[in-house]
C-alpha cells in the first residue's frame, strides 16, 4: 500500500510538473528569487501577483507579439531580460524592438495614419497625450481597464502609485497611456570643483557672489564664463564651463520642445503645464481643448521675446563656452563627451543617463572617484529672466505604454499583459535600480534607494522632493505632436548655421506652426478628425496688443539680472525638510 502511494505520488508530481500552470509557477519562483529583488512586495505577494499573470495569460499562451520603444538602458533591460521572464512565466513570446526616438514616433504616426497594426503596443512619450486624446486612435485605458480589458487588468496595478499619471491624462480626465519610465532634465555640475576653496574665492572676487548651484540663467552664464575664460585649466586639463549640442538634426527639435522656452520663462503659470500658454508657445484657453495659435499675433508665445532670448542664449553659450566642435554635435555625440571630465556644468541634462555617468573609472568615466562615487551632482534647472513662481521649471520624459484600436483585441490584451508585467510591483523596483528611471513613488522611497542614494548624484533626493512636480512633459496644448515637432529642428537648425537670426527663426517657426494648425482646423471642422478639439485659430492682432496683456506672451524684460546661486548641500536640506 505504501509502495502504491509512493508510485501514485510520483505520477501525480510528474503530471503537475509537466502542466503549464505548474511550470509557470516554478519559473515565476525562480525569477522572483534570482532576479526580481529587491521589491516593495514580500515574496509571497510577488508569487500571488505572478499567479494572476499565469491565469490571465492562459488564453494567449503560445502567441507571439511585437512591441516597440526607444533605446535607453531601461528598455534594453525590458527587451533582453523581461521578455524572457514573461515568456517563461506566461508562455507568451514578446519581440521588444529598440529604435531611436524619432523612428518610434514615425512608427506611431504610420500606424495612426494607415490603421495597419505594425506593433501590438508602443512605449511612446507622453508628449503625444494631446495627440492621442484628440485623434481617439489610441485606447482610452480608463475605459479599457473597466470594460473590454478588465479580465486582463492587474488588480494590484495601483495607478495612484505612478508619479506620472497626470502626464498621461487627457483633457477628458481619462488615462491614455501607462508610464513605463520617467526621467527629468536637470542641471548637472562638478560638485568637487564647486567645493574648492580657491575656485570659490576667485569666483566671488570676480562676480561678487558665491559659486554654487545657479538659480537663474545669469548665474549659469557667469559660471560658464568663469570656468571657460578665467579658470581654463584644472589639474593640467583644459576645461569648459558649458556643454550642449547644435547639429541640424531631429534631436535638436526636442532639445527645444523639451521645455527650453519654459525654462527661460516663456509660458504661463500652471502645473503640470502652463495655462493658457504652454512650453511650445501654443495658446489654449483654460477649460477648452482648442489651441488658438503659436504666434504672438494670435496670443501665442513661440516668437515672443522670451522664446527669442532662449534660442539666442542656446546659440551664444554653445559658441562661447562649450568645447570645440560641440556646435556640430548631435545629442548622441554630446553624451559621451561629458564623461571625459572636462566640463564644469550642463544646463540641459537628462537623468536617464545617470547609469552611464556612474560607470566605473576604469571604463573611461572621468567623473567618478576611485571608489566609484560621483564627483558631480544633479540639481534643479536654473530659470531665465521671464520665469515666474508657479511655472514649470523643466522637462520630464514619461515613456508610456500606448495601445491602439487598430490592434486586434486578442493581441492587444496579450500586449497589455506584458506592459503591466514590466511595471508591476514585482518587477518595477529592480527595473528602476537597473535603468534609474523611476515611475512608482513606492519604489523611489524604498530603503534600497536610501542606501544607494550617495552613489547616484542627487537622483533619489530629487525624486523624493516636492520640487519634482515642476518638471513635466509636453502637455495637451500640442494637438498633433508628430506634425508639429519636425518644424522645430528645421527652423532652429538655421540659427546654428547662421542663415537666420533667433528672431527670424522663431518668426518662421511660429508662422509655420500656425499654418499646420490651420490645416488641422479645416480637417477637424470638416470631419471631426481631432474629435472637435482641433485648433481654432484666433484672428491676428498686433504684437503690442498681446504683449500688453497680462501673462504670456510677455514683453521684453531686463535679460541680465543679478546672478543668484544656492549651496547644493543647503538645497538638499531644504528638500529633506519638506
List where the protein language model places each region.
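Long, aromatic- and glycine/proline-rich binding clefts that accommodate carbohydrate-like moieties
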Residues: 50-52, 64, 373-383, 395, ...
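Short, polar/charged alpha-helical segment
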Residues: 49-56, 73-91, 188, 192-194, ...
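Periplasmic solute-binding protein
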Residues: 126-137, 142-146, 162-209, 221, ...
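Extracytoplasmic/periplasmic substrate-recognition and gating elements
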Residues: 169, 319-324, 333, 342-345, ...
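Short helix-initiation/N-cap motifs at beta->coil->alpha
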Residues: 99-107, 215-219, 326-339
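Glycine-centered hinge/linker elements that transmit conformational signals in sensory
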Residues: 219-225, 262-328, 372, 381
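Hinge/lid segment of periplasmic solute-binding proteins
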Residues: 25-59, 126-186, 281, 375-381, ...
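Extracytoplasmic "Venus flytrap"/periplasmic binding protein-like
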Residues: 84-162, 196-198, 202-204, 344-345, ...
Amino acid at each position: 500500500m505504501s509502495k502504491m502511494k509512493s508510485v501514485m505520488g510520483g505520477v501525480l508530481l510528474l503530471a503537475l510538473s509537466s502542466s503549464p500552470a505548474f511550470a509557470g509557477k516554478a519559473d515565476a519562483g525562480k525569477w522572483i528569487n534570482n532576479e526580481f529583488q529587491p521589491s516593495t512586495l514580500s515574496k509571497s505577494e510577488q508569487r500571488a501577483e505572478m499567479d494572476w499573470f499565469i491565469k490571465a495569460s492562459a488564453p494567449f499562451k503560445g502567441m507571439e507579439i511585437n512591441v516597440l520603444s526607444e533605446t535607453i538602458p531601461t528598455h534594453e533591460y525590458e527587451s533582453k531580460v523581461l521578455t524572457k521572464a514573461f515568456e517563461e512565466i506566461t508562455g507568451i513570446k514578446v519581440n521588444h524592438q529598440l529604435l531611436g526616438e524619432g523612428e518610434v514616433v514615425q512608427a506611431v504616426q504610420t500606424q495612426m495614419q494607415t490603421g495597419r497594426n505594425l506593433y501590438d503596443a508602443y512605449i511612446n512619450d507622453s508628449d503625444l497625450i494631446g495627440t492621442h486624446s484628440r485623434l481617439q486612435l489610441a485606447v482610452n485605458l480608463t475605459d479599457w481597464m473597466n470594460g473590454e480589458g478588465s479580465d486582463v487588468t492587474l488588480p494590484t496595478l495601483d495607478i495612484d502609485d505612478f508619479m506620472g499619471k497626470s502626464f498621461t491624462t487627457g483633457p477628458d480626465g481619462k488615462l491614455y497611456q501607462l508610464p513605463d519610465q520617467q526621467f527629468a532634465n536637470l542641471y548637472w555640475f562638478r560638485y568637487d570643483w564647486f567645493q574648492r576653496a580657491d575656485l570659490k574665492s576667485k569666483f566671488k572676487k570676480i562676480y561678487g557672489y558665491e559659486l554654487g548651484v545657479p538659480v537663474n540663467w545669469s548665474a549659469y552664464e557667469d559660471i560658464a564664463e568663469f570656468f571657460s575664460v578665467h579658470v581654463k585649466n584644472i589639474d593640467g586639463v583644459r576645461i569648459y564651463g558649458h556643454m550642449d549640442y547644435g547639429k541640424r538634426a531631429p534631436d535638436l527639435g526636442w532639445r527645444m520642445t523639451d521645455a527650453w522656452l519654459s525654462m527661460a520663462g516663456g509660458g504661463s503659470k500652471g502645473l503640470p503645464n502652463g495655462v493658457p500658454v504652454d512650453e511650445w508657445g501654443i495658446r489654449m484657453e483654460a477649460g477648452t481643448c482648442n489651441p488658438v495659435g503659436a504666434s504672438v499675433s494670435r496670443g501665442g508665445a513661440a516668437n515672443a521675446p522670451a522664446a527669442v532670448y532662449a534660442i539666442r542664449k542656446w546659440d551664444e553659450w554653445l559658441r562661447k563656452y562649450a568645447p570645440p566642435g560641440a556646435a556640430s554635435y548631435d545629442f548622441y555625440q554630446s553624451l559621451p563627451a561629458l564623461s571625459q571630465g572636462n566640463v564644469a556644468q550642463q544646463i540641459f541634462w537628462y537623468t536617464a543617463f545617470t547609469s552611464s555617468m556612474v560607470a566605473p573609472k576604469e571604463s573611461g568615466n572621468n567623473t567618478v572617484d576611485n571608489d566609484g562615487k560621483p564627483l558631480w551632482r544633479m540639481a534643479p534647472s536654473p530659470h531665465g529672466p521671464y520665469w515666474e513662481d508657479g511655472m514649470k521649471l523643466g522637462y520630464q520624459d514619461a515613456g508610456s505604454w500606448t495601445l491602439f484600436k487598430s490592434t486586434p483585441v486578442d493581441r492587444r490584451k496579450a500586449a497589455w499583459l506584458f506592459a503591466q508585467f514590466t511595471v508591476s510591483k514585482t518587477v518595477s523596483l529592480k527595473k528602476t535600480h537597473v535603468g534609474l528611471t523611476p515611475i512608482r513613488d513606492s519604489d523611489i522611497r524604498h530603503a534600497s534607494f536610501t542606501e544607494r542614494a550617495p552613489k547616484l548624484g542627487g537622483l533619489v533626493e530629487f525624486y523624493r522632493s516636492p520640487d519634482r512636480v515642476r518638471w513635466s512633459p509636453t502637455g495637451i496644448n500640442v494637438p498633433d505632436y508628430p506634425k508639429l515637432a519636425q518644424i522645430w529642428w528645421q527652423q532652429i537648425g538655421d540659427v546654428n548655421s547662421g542663415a537666420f537670426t533667433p528672431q527670424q527663426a522663431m518668426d518662421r517657426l511660429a508662422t509655420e506652426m500656425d499654418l499646420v494648425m490651420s490645416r488641422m482646423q479645416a480637417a477637424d471642422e470638416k470631419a471631426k478628425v481631432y474629435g472637435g478639439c482641433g485648433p481654432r485659430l484666433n484672428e491676428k492682432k498686433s504684437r503690442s496688443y498681446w504683449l500688453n496683456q497680462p501673462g504670456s506672451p510677455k514683453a521684453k524684460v531686463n535679460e541680465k539680472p543679478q546672478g543668484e546661486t544656492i549651496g547644493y548641500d543647503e538645497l538638499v536640506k531644504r528638500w529633506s525638510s519638506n
